From Swiss-Prot:
SMART domains xref list: CYCLIN, Cyclin_C
CDD domains in the record: CYCLIN_CCND2_rpt1, CYCLIN_CCND2_rpt2
Gene, per the UniProt record: CCND2
Descriptive protein name: G1/S-specific cyclin-D2
GO biological process entries: cell division; G1/S transition of mitotic cell cycle; positive regulation of G1/S transition of mitotic cell cycle
């Protein structure tokens, strides 16, 4: 009799390093270097002639879907979008090459963040084989050259743990807060309006939006309204008014995305009620966010 073993070894992960998380010098260094990895300009105005903002959103949505389907680490998608924005800020690109560029950026980001990175062949399949593996590998060298091999970019995810550990949060809610903040960060990466924002501001605004959405301010005044905003602003040395504006913009993006999802679902299933659609189809990590 043959035995079929269906057990899967869990992904081995390093334990949190207190020498990194509890040393304020690490946070200070991240804040010092984060702007080095921002796009040099608002490239739709002065660099790109063939590519429009809606095209970036389309390729970003496709990249996010690929990363989710492949169960990539949370950091892969925002890092790939950082590469894409920095490349587009210096190289005029034809719209027919935009998906190829997105695939290359995911290829590079997964090499940096994944234990088992995405393969060129698999990424080509996700483009319906509109590009070839050799073409992707050739573009990989082009992108590396234009980015000057500076791939270890600072992203909002680098700040999440530093922010969470300084807040008086209930331990049983940390996983949920972290998941919601990661969802907000991914949404921000799909929207070009956030491309020029420092990663620390996006991270701080995402954590603030997550805490407000989960309504964790019932028993602790430091987690409510302006008190929370002031506290978060001090952690990352962010201007309070800028942080408020960023958080409001993040919440607005979420509301807009939820509305768009519902409209698409109603068009495809006109006989179902909104409540039925919410229960059946809306992604869990988005539905659980309460504004």
């Amino acid at each position: 009799m043959e035995l079929l073993c269906c057990e899967v070894d869990p992904m081995r992960r390093a334990l949190p390093d207190p020498n990194l998380l509890y040393d304020d010098r690490v946070l200070h260094n991240l804040l010092t270097i984060e702007e080095r990895y921002l796009p040099q300009c608002s490239y739709f105005k002065c660099v790109q002639k063939d590519i429009q903002p809606f095209m970036r959103r389309m390729v970003a949505t496709w990249m996010l879907e690929v990363c989710e389907e492949q169960k990539c680490e949370e950091e892969v998608f925002p890092l790939a979008m950082n590469y894409l924005d920095r490349f587009l800020a210096v190289v005029p690109t034809r719209k027919c090459h935009l998906q190829l560029l997105g695939a290359v950026c995911m290829f590079l980001a997964s090499k940096l963040k994944e234990t088992i990175p995405l393969t060129a062949e698999k990424l080509c399949i996700y483009t319906d084989n509109s590009i070839k593996p050799q073409e992707l590998l050739e573009w990989e060298l082009v992108v590396l050259g234009k980015l000057k091999w500076n791939l270890a970019a600072v992203t909002p995810h680098d700040f999440i743990e530093h922010i969470l550990r300084k807040l008086p949060l209930p331990k049983d809610k940390l996983v949920l807060i972290r998941k919601h903040a990661q969802t907000f960060i991914a949404l921000c990466a799909t929207d070009f309006n956030f491309a020029m924002y420092p990663p620390s501001m996006i991270a701080t605004g995402s954590v603030g939006a997550a805490i407000c959405g989960l309504q964790l301010d019932d028993g602790d005044r430091s987690l409510s309204g302006d008190s929370l905003t002031d506290f978060l602003a001090k952690i990352t040395s962010t201007d309070v008014d800028c942080l408020k504006a960023c958080q409001e913009q993040i919440e607005s993006v979420l509301v807009s995305n939820l509305r768009q999802v519902r409209q698409q679902q109603q068009q495809s299933n006109p006989s179902k009620t909104i409540e039925e659609l919410d229960q059946a189809s809306t992604p869990t990590d988005v539905r659980d966010i309460n504004l």
